[in-house]
UniProtKB/Swiss-Prot annotation:
Annotated keywords: Cytoplasm, Methyltransferase, S-adenosyl-L-methionine, Transferase
Residues annotated to bind S-adenosyl-L-methionine: 146, 167, 189, 231
Organism per entry: Vibrio vulnificus (strain YJ016)
Lineage, highest ranks first: Bacteria, Pseudomonadati, Pseudomonadota, Gammaproteobacteria, Vibrionales
PANTHER family per UniProt: ELECTRON TRANSFER FLAVOPROTEIN BETA SUBUNIT LYSINE METHYLTRANSFERASE
Known role: Methylates ribosomal protein L11.
Protein's UniProt name: Ribosomal protein L11 methyltransferase
Substrates-to-products reaction catalysed: L-lysyl-[protein] + 3 S-adenosyl-L-methionine = N(6),N(6),N(6)-trimethyl-L-lysyl-[protein] + 3 S-adenosyl-L-homocysteine + 3 H(+)
Family the entry assigns: Belongs to the methyltransferase superfamily. PrmA family.
Compartments (UniProt record): Cytoplasm
This enzyme's EC code(s): 2.1.1.-
Gene Ontology CC annotations of this record: cytosol
Amino acid sequence: MPWIQIKLNATNENAELIGDMLMEETGALSVTFLDAHDTPVFEPLPGETRLWGDTDVLALYDAEADTQLIMSQIKASNMLAEGFAYKIEQLEDKDWEREWMDNFHPMKFGQRLWICPSWRDIPDPTAVNVMLDPGLAFGTGTHPTTALCLEWLEGLDLSGKTVIDFGCGSGILAIAAIKLGAEKVIGIDIDPQALLASKDNAQRNGVADQLDVYLPQDQPEGLLADVVVANILAAPLRELSSIIKGLVKPNGQLAMSGVLDTQAEDVANYYRDELHIDPIVEQSEWCRISGRKQG
């Protein structure tokens, strides 16, 4: 059945209150917050709000909803300034699962690595192919930080090497490393669900025997790897720099992402005491910091 969507422009100070009012007083089936200027917020600074300064509040109603009554209730709430901007539109009914699936295509990284959803044909059967379906929480290659790490791994000779995926999420980097020739890969994550996702995805790719996963407190003592990749965020890369450096063998290599261009130099400085840092690589305001540990 079709749906009715009402979009209101709000500020970050009242967006959540407006959302609550729409759910409780006007019968909205769902409420979504979007940045009115398409500006993503991935890692707020301490004390910053997670909403944007100019926020669109989207409320969804069934097709029989009385929009005049809803608008009168919104105006009566006095939560929005007089003459506030809004938009009412009817959304056609669709096969939303099919629409969602159609948005995902095989993606190529470097010269020979492909990440492919399971419902798509493999573009090049002779290439290195990782089969991975998009999920709700973990990486699938679409974000620049994941892409930067995949391209870096694809450019290495991983034959016979041990790799640590620090903050493994879906296991995409760990699985790619195995498919690219790594002998053994260890995934570490603070989220037990990430460890389950990594093992499940490794099983689907036929490489589960080469992947061990651990919560940080459970990882083996003295764990070392030839290659370490950490696609997390700037704050934990700074806070955990001693731990991450300690996972890299002498002459081993490290790559980190989840870092904005404005944060890259500061994060890199936490690693310069033990690593020779490569030129920082940027993609869509995100950066990859890589280097080799001194022997």
